[in-house]
C-alpha cells in the first residue's frame, strides 16, 4: 500500500524509488533464449523504461510504471513475463489486460516474437472471437493470457480460466481501461486472483482511478514515473492549420495532399459518423482509403489493419479506437481531422508517427472554436504546436 504521495512529479525524466538501472540486455540475468529473441526482434539496447522496470518485475516486485506509447513498454512487460514463466508448468501463470482487442493482439504478437525460442504458449482472450477457441486454449493449459476485461472475467466466472497458478497480473494502458467502463470488471478480476499475485501496472497518465488501484491492490510498488512535462514524443513535429470552420476541413485536407508526398497516413476523427463521411468523400476523390471504428466486426477490423500494414491502403481513417498501441511502422503522418475530445488521447494519436526515434509529423485541423482546446493540449504536455509552414512538402521530400 505504498502509493501515498504519487500525485505530481516535479523533476527529472524518470522518478523512481528503485535504484538499479541496467544498460544492457545481457546484464539483466535473462534466460539466454529470451535475449536471443530480443535481439531477433530488433532491439539492441534497453530503452529508459526497460533499463529500470525489467529487473524489479523479474524479481517479483509490484511495479507502477508511467510510460507513453513508443517507449518500449510492451516489450518491458513481455520480457519480464517470459522470464517469470515456468515453461514446464502447463497452467496460466501470467494475465495481461488491455483496453482494446487490437492492442491485446498486438501484445500477443510481441510475446510470440520475443518468445520465439521458448516453449511458452500464449493466447488472446478477447471479445468478438469464438468462445470455443477460448475454452479449448484454457483446457490445454495456456501459460500467458492476453485479453480484454469483459471476456477474461467471463472465462474466470465460467471456470474455464483457472486462476490458482496466476503469479503475474499486468494492466497495460491502465488509465484508459479504468476510465472507460472497465473498472468494475477489473476490480472483480483482482478479487478472483491469488492474494500473492504480482501486480504490474502501466499507464501513460496517472489519474485518480489509477492511483486508487495502487493503494487497494498493490504491495509497496516500485514506482517508475515519467514527468508529465516530458509526455510528448521526441521526433514528432507538431503543426496546426487554422481551418476557421468545420465545413472547410475537407478542402483543406485535399489541398494538403496536393502539396505533400506521403507513403501512408492515419487520420483521426472523433465520431464514427465523421469517419464514414470522410471515407466516402475521399473515395469520391479517388483516394485509396480504409476506415476503422469500434462498431465494425472483429474480422473486418483485422482485415483492414492487415491491408494497411501491407501498404495496399495508403490512408487509414479511425476513431480513438486505434490511438492506443497499434504499431504501424511505416506511418510518417498523423492528421487530427478533429482534435481529440479527451486531451489525454492526443499523445496516443500522434505517437503513431515516430516510434523509437522514427521521425513523424502530426498536423492538427483547428477551427476557431478549437483554439482553446489546442492551447490546453499544449499546456498539458508542455509542448508547442506551431502553425504549419508553407513549405510543408519539404518535410516529406
Swiss-Prot record:
Transmembrane region(s): none
EC number per UniProt: 3.6.4.13
SUPFAM superfamilies documented for this protein: P-loop containing nucleoside triphosphate hydrolases (SSF52540)
Domain Helicase C-terminal: 235-396
Keyword Nucleotide-binding in record: yes
Catalytic activity: ATP + H2O = ADP + phosphate + H(+)
Keyword tags: ATP-binding, Cytoplasm, Helicase, Hydrolase, Initiation factor, Nucleotide-binding, Protein biosynthesis, RNA-binding
Motif Q motif location, chain numbering: 23-51
Residues reported to bind ATP: 67-74
Record text about domains: The Q motif is unique to and characteristic of the DEAD box family of RNA helicases and controls ATP binding and hydrolysis.
Functional note: ATP-dependent RNA helicase which is a subunit of the eIF4F complex involved in cap recognition and is required for mRNA binding to ribosome. In the current model of translation initiation, eIF4A unwinds RNA secondary structures in the 5'-UTR of mRNAs which is necessary to allow efficient binding of the small ribosomal subunit, and subsequent scanning for the initiator codon.
Family statement drawn from the similarity comment of this UniProt entry: Belongs to the DEAD box helicase family. eIF4A subfamily.
Oligomeric form and interacting partners: Component of the eIF4F complex, which composition varies with external and internal environmental conditions. It is composed of at least eIF4A, eIF4E and eIF4G.
Protein name: ATP-dependent RNA helicase eIF4A
